[in-house]
């Protein structure tokens, strides 16, 4: 979508905010039709600022802004739709993880409308305390596809033959799924039927969930090129703590 000098009532979510001056902040948002946008919220740190109560993560917002440069000026903010129930615990950490993915991978001012809709759906699922792992996997899969790094769950990487349910495969982040008979050095083997289940978005089986988590983790780490997400560090600490109980 082409840039516009003035945007009004754009459905958006706050991803991150940082100080800009004694009274103002830079807010990084994810919007429905303009993707990631950075805005200066003038006076937002003042106690009586009109923005103060609205600029919080995970609230459905309508924002208006203006400007020709990459850093726009926030003009108006209001709640769009109903408040979600408060997101807590691991669900809250998972929501911050999605924000980190968005900030790490999405290009500025490119629309990702399908991903925006899935993000909103994910927040609703977190607020209802729905199972976390299927929500994360669905978001990760779509995000990688939207930015051009789609994982091919349909065909074998070398032969381009369809994935077969009764064959075993290994996953190579830079290639995709390779038949085990062609790549015997990997300790992680994925059943063809599991790959097919992931492709269908069917995470009812525990083995599918575990394999999907490993596949998406390796793929995201590969494309992060050595960078580690802060939320992932916290996840690992929680997992170690849970394992010691």
Please provide the spans of the model-predicted regions:
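Non-catalytic alpha-helical scaffolds and adjoining flexible linkers that form interface surfaces
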Residues: 1-26, 30-245
């Amino acid at each position: 979508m082409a840039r516009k000098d003035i945007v009004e009532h754009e459905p958006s979510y706050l991803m991150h905010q940082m100080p800009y001056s004694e009274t103002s902040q830079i807010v990084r948002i994810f919007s429905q039709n303009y993707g990631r946008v950075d805005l200066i919220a003038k006076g937002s740190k003042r106690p009586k600022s009109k923005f103060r109560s609205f600029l919080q993560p995970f609230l459905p917002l309508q924002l208006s802004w203006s400007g020709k440069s990459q850093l726009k000026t926030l003009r108006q903010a209001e709640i769009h739709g109903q408040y979600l129930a408060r997101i807590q615990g691991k669900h809250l950490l998972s929501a911050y993880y999605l924000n980190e993915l968005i900030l790490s991978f999405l290009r500025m001012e490119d629309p990702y409308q399908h991903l925006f809709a899935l993000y909103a759906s994910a927040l609703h699922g977190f607020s209802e305390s729905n199972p976390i792992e299927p929500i994360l996997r669905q978001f990760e899969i779509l995000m990688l596809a939207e930015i051009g790094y789609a994982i091919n769950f349909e065909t074998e990487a070398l032969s381009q033959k369809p994935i077969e349910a009764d064959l075993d495969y290994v996953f190579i982040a830079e290639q995709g799924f390779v038949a085990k008979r062609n790549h015997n050095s990997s300790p992680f083997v994925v059943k063809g039927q599991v790959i097919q289940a992931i492709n269908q978005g069917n995470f009812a089986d525990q083995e599918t969930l575990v394999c999907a988590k490993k596949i998406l983790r390796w793929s995201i780490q590969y494309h992060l090129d050595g960078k580690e997400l802060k939320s992932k560090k916290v996840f690992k600490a929680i997992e170690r703590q849970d394992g010691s109980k």
